[in-house]
Regions:
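Juxtamembrane regions of bacterial inner-membrane/periplasmic proteins
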Residues: 2-244
Length: 244
């Protein structure tokens, strides 16, 4: 019954228009378009919310990014890893690298956005929640339609998932190298350990490759990985890692 009412076409007949005069009749097609747009928009939003709610409990089996990557690279075996089985230092490292204020905001880091706008920088200010929305529900690449959908998905995820669930899903679908998706595959392929056994140095190096997983090597130390290790220690001290 709910689904039937959800997808029932909107009533677009407006008999009162004919009595209102020719002006009202002239605007009738536009009003019908607006009614249909509102009907479609509300149904699309409802379906997005349902999908987000499902993935609050069910682990995403795959993503568009993984499917696309499988056409050019063999995909390493990807076993889902619960957040409790990921080393705390790995959780802190990825937050320090990608979204230091992850525990403090509701999907959009407005202070970081203001910094980017003020500096005129071309670098992004996407939070881990925004990246999770893109990686799980959408596609890669820059486009206004994708960014719009990401902006809708982000508050839905924040409302329906816990912070730990967001980070768990993010770490299980993120790409760490060509064909290497998820922290379980990354820890095994690069270091021969489980995610729970990752050291601070290994965690920092894995987090360092996330912006460019196809071109960066997690077996090599870098200034970025050292900065991430320092950042992970900092957010552990100042309380910004309390939600992890």
């Amino acid at each position: 019954m709910f689904l039937r009412s959800l997808f029932r076409p909107p009533a677009t007949e407006m008999p009162a228009d004919a009595a209102a005069g020719p002006g009202a009749v002239r605007w009738r097609p536009l009003r019908r378009v607006l009614i249909w747009l509102r009907w479609f928009g509300l149904r699309a939003l409802a379906l997005m919310a349902v999908l987000v709610a499902i993935y609050a409990l069910v682990n995403p089996p795959t993503t568009w990014t993984i499917v696309a990557a499988s056409r050019s690279d063999p995909i390493s075996t990807r076993d889902w890893v619960d957040i409790g089985d990921i080393a705390p230092v790995m959780r802190r490292s990825v937050v320090a690298a990608e979204d230091a204020n992850f525990c403090l905001h509701w999907g959009f880091d407005m202070s970081e956005i203001r910094k980017v706008v003020a500096s005129g920088s071309s670098r992004g200010a996407s939070t881990i929640t925004q990246q999770t929305a893109k990686n799980v529900f959408l596609w890669q690449g820059r486009s206004w339609p994708r960014k719009l959908l990401e902006t809708i998905y982000t508050p839905l995820i924040e409302a329906l998932w816990s912070k730990q669930r967001i980070l768990e899903v993010y770490l299980n679908v993120a790409e760490f190298g060509p064909g290497i998706f998820g922290i379980g595959a990354a820890a095994r392929e690069f270091y021969g350990v489980t995610p729970a056994q990752l050291t601070a140095r290994q965690a920092a190096r894995l987090a360092a490759v996330l912006p460019a997983p196809k071109s960066r090597d997690p077996n090599r130390a870098s200034a970025r990985s050292r900065a991430i290790a320092d950042g992970a220690a900092t957010i552990a001290r100042d309380g910004r890692a309390d939600c992890l």
